[in-house]
Amino acid sequence: MIINYELNPPKILPKDYFSYSNLLDNIDNVKKKVKILCEYSHSIHFTDSVLGIPRISSITMANIIKKYNDSIKISCSIRTRDRNLTSMYQIIFDPILYNIESLLILLGDQPRNDLGTHNLLKPSKVVNLFNSQEFKKSIKLNLSIPNKIRNINNTVQRKIDAKPYAFVTQSIESLKDLENIIDLIRPFDIKVIACIMLPSQKNKRSAELIGLNWQEYEKEPIEFIRNCGRIADEVLLTSPNHFTLATEILKELR
């Protein structure tokens, strides 16, 4: 079973003002977490300004980590909401240069101070374009997919047509939901990476924000993760507010 772990880069304005020294301290905290995770996780995935809250870019954070340990496998999320096509070309070159494993291209959440949502780049169009231009030979390009799929609608079909290396699910609620996704996607020769949020009181607010109901696996998260790992190509664990729990579970899964 391939288990990856998701980390959020530090916030740029954690207290509504910028402090360079605080930012450096928070970067050091991420470094410490990565050092621990390397013992138990196949790779690290850095998010890109989750919930529209400005953070150090995933690519910058990956480069910082790579500078002190280039052997660590890292993947990154990239939001298209904040970028035009020119900046996407600039962005895709950097992870290739830094030897990053893959990119998850996604629209991203709307920032609180967003002035508009016109002419947004669709992630599927970006992946389709970059794949047609042979970027896929240098880096894996992934797309996100809902945690529940009953059939292949137009939105899912467009993502399939983009031919990503893998689909990364939104946080999975049940094994049956994951089985449905895999049954629908596997015929297209696209891998499925199951994202799972660890159930914890400290993570409850994060779960509520994305409408996640972890009732099915709350009491037996390790068994649930193992079952998901048996049918998905990879598992991506996330525990945004409870890192100690994450390390405990990763040790048991090792």
Segments and roles (model prediction):
Residues 1-28, 74-86, 139-152, 208-219:
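Active-site mouth loops of central-metabolism enzymes
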Residues 1-3, 225-253:
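C-terminal extensions of enzymes
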Residues 3-9, 42-46, 74-78, 103-105, ...:
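Hydrophobic faces of well-ordered beta-strands that scaffold small-molecule active sites
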Residues 7-11, 48-52, 80-82, 107-111, ...:
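Active-site-proximal loop/turn and secondary-structure-junction residues that shape catalytic pockets
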Residues 28-47, 159-168, 230:
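Catalytic domains of carbohydrate-active enzymes, especially glycoside hydrolases
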Residues 51-75, 212-216:
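Flavin-dependent oxidoreductase catalytic cores
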Residues 52-65, 83-90, 109-132, 150-152, ...:
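Active-site-adjacent beta->alpha loops and helix N-cap segments on the catalytic face
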Residues 189-234:
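Catalytic-face loop-and-helix region of soluble metabolic enzyme cores
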